[in-house]
């Protein structure tokens, strides 16, 4: 028996933020970051809930730390809001999820009413507004901790593309490639099904169609709107099917070398596709993952006279997209130091093997496979 979980309720399109003015509540807590305050986005959100007592926590960093989450939690518990609104990229939403999860754990000892949780993404990348996943950083151990619990799922998501129009090209590229990685991994994971395939396929098509457009022309609101929906669709897909080692390695590399999550995923993607498909060991003809990758190639209208050709075509298409988006092809080109990578190799492999995403990977991965893969991603095709 298979299952497919769909939540939250989604308001989308231009001016969908106006939904906030319909809230009949007394206390609101907004979780965001300094940039959202500087750009006036936090005040815009606040303007829709003027009839409430509103607290703004704006200290979420790009990779939310456990310390920040704990600090926000103390304010959150003291404030006792009726509604929590997470506004920003994946980091504020992930932080809000962690706050909600920890407050729910605390409520087992101290009575605390769960607030309505509204997620308002301002980038098109993580899909965090429709997932029960969160990633926080343990700065003491220098690792990213991905975890999942249905209690972290937002109750409402608001997808207003107007909030994405100030996102700079580099961030647009990185977050857009995160969408593509989510969708492709969700499509080939062990628990993929007919429903997740449907959402993943739509997201993949949208990325190849609209991401180059919005990267070149940031004011293309049609493209921004479609990428916002693609991010959400990919999130729905992977929340049900899981992810794979692309994300496991990206979590470790991002924490150690300061790479943005989307950029780390983008650099890894062509290599992970080839590894999972069996192009490296000659098993592509019988690999279930290879057949799924080839299906993507066929859907995109790429050469696909055989399974192997389909995989090769998809890899070439991903690499071309990277080039269009000015994303480096290797870890070396991204500025990662060779010696530092070697020194951290065992730690990266251990982190990736323990990462919750690895269980969904379509192919078993041995420690030696991780080593070869990381060396390959560092050096590129020689």
Task: State what each model feature region is.
Residues 8, 101-194, 288-295:
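A glycine/threonine-rich phosphate-anchoring loop and its flanking beta-alpha core
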Residues 1-83, 331:
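ATP/NTP phosphate-donor binding region
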Residues 173-233, 237:
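C-terminal and late-domain segments of enzyme folds
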Residues 125, 232-265, 355-360:
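Glycine-rich phosphate/pyrophosphate-binding beta-alpha loops
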Residues 340-382:
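Short, amphipathic C-terminal "tail helix"
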Residues 263-340:
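Gly/Pro-rich interdomain helix-loop hinge
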Residues 90:
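Acidic-aromatic/histidine active-site loop/patch
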Residues 192-199, 215-226, 241-246, 283-286, ...:
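Flexible, glycine/charged-enriched surface loops at secondary-structure junctions
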């Amino acid at each position: 028996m298979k299952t497919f979980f769909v939540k939250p309720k989604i308001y989308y399109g231009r001016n969908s933020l106006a939904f906030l003015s319909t809230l009949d509540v007394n206390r609101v807590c907004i979780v965001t970051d300094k940039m959202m305050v500087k750009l006036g986005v936090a005040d815009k959100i606040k303007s829709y809930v003027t009839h409430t007592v509103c607290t703004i926590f704006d200290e979420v960093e790009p990779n939310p730390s456990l310390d920040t989450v704990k600090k926000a939690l103390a304010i959150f518990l003291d404030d006792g809001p009726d509604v929590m609104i997470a506004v920003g990229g994946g980091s504020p939403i992930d932080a809000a999820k962690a706050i909600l999860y920890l407050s729910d754990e605390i409520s087992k000892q101290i009575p605390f009413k769960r607030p309505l949780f509204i997620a308002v993404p301002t980038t098109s990348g993580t899909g965090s507004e429709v997932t029960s996943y969160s990633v926080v950083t343990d700065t003491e151990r220098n690792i990213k901790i991905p975890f999942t619990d249905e209690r972290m799922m937002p109750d409402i998501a608001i997808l207003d593309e107007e909030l994405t129009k100030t996102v700079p090209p580099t961030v647009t590229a990185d977050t857009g490639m995160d969408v593509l990685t989510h969708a492709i991994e969700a499509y080939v994971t062990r628990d993929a099904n007919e429903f997740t395939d449907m959402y993943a396929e739509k997201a993949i098509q949208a990325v190849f169609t609209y991401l180059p457009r919005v990267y070149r022309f940031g004011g293309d609101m049609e493209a921004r709107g479609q990428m916002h929906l693609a991010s959400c669709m990919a999130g729905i897909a992977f929340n049900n099917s899981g992810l794979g080692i692309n994300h496991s390695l990206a979590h470790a590399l991002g924490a150690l070398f300061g790479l943005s999550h989307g950029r780390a995923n983008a650099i890894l993607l062509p290599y992970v596709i080839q590894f999972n498909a069996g192009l490296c060991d000659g098993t592509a003809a019988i690999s279930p993952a290879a057949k799924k990758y080839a299906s993507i190639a066929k859907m995109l209208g790429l050469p696909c006279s055989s399974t192997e050709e389909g995989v090769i075509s998809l890899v070439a298409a991903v690499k071309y997209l990277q080039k269009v988006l000015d994303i480096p092809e290797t870890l070396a080109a991204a500025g990662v130091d060779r010696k530092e990578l070697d020194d951290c190799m065992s730690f990266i492999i251990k982190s990736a093997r323990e990462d919750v995403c690895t269980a969904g990977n379509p192919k078993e991965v041995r420690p030696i496979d991780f080593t070869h893969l990381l060396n390959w991603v560092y050096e590129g095709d020689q």
